[in-house]
Structure formats: structure tokens, C-alpha cells
Amino acid sequence: NESFIKLAQDFAELALNFDSKEDFLAADFNGITVAEKLIEQTGVIGEKIEIRSFERLNGAFIGSYIHAGNKIATLVALSANVEGADEVAKNVSMQAAAMAPIALNEAGVDADTIAKEIEIAKDLLRQEGKPEAILDNIAKGKLARFFKDNTLVNQDYIKDNKLSVADYVKSLDKNLIVTGFKRAALEIGR
């Protein structure tokens, strides 16, 4: 629906001025608050509209990608605005859309997820009959593979799998790094 897309674009533009969801929802939007506009539009289109999350991404250069069909959108922050940053940021944003990483790097993976992955690896190794004495070392290797598959900068770059995403970014400028990313997917019926 064209009017919904326009509303979403207007909200996105307005959201740039706020640091929290609460402040954004309380903001003026043509004489009413954003929260009131959401309720009004829910009545118009017959579907509940809500802002589920609100995060600010900071960086010297922010690139974006919206996947065909407008169901997935990503933002990527780079450490510098160098020539070619727009193309690199878009390509890394496409990577984040396609590969759905859970974190930027190892440091961004929560401790519970790490513990769970180690335990899964150990359980599988036990089922294979591996001795307890070597489980920790093999599980560490499996955890490294988990990080490679599930953290953005460590993933194989989808356009050249000989490079990690971090290496691809550094191919533009040796000091350039990805400092953050956000991935949002449309959830219907929740």
C-alpha cells in the first residue's frame, strides 16, 4: 500500500532525530504523536502497526540495503567515509540480509549462546565416542566454525568466498572496519 510505504518513510526520516523508542513515540507527527498516528493507521488498514524495536547505529559512514519485496532491511556502519565506502557498505548490507548473522563479531555473541554451542558440540562428540579428554579442544574448533558462520565480519563474503567480510572491507582501505550493523525482517502475524 503506497500510503503505508510513505508513512514508513516519513517515520524513518523523523526517527533520525531520536535516541530512544519512547522519545520517538512521543514525538510530534503532524499535530499528533507518533504513537497516536500508529493507532490511527491501525484503524485505517485493519492491521496492528507497532514499533517493536528502535536502535541507533553510529558510524563515520552508514550504508543500507532493502531486499526485494521490502521484507528485509539492513544497515551497516563503517569506521570511515572513504572513497568507495558506499559500495562496500551496500555489499556488506546485502551480506547481512542474505546470511542473517547473529552478531558483528565474537564479542557480540552472548555468553549463553556460546555455552549452548559448546555443549551441543560436546554432546555430538560424546555420541561419536570421542574421549572426554579431547572434547574441550575439539569443541573450541567447532565454536570457531560457529563464529565464522554466524558473525558478520567472520563470514565468507558472498561475492568472493576466498575472503571474509572483514578482509573484503579492508581491501578498500586497510584501516577500514565494520563497526556495527542492524538487520530487520518484517514479521507478519505476530
Where on the chain are the PLM-derived regions?
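N-terminal assembly/interaction segments in proteins that build large macromolecular machines
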Residues: 1-190
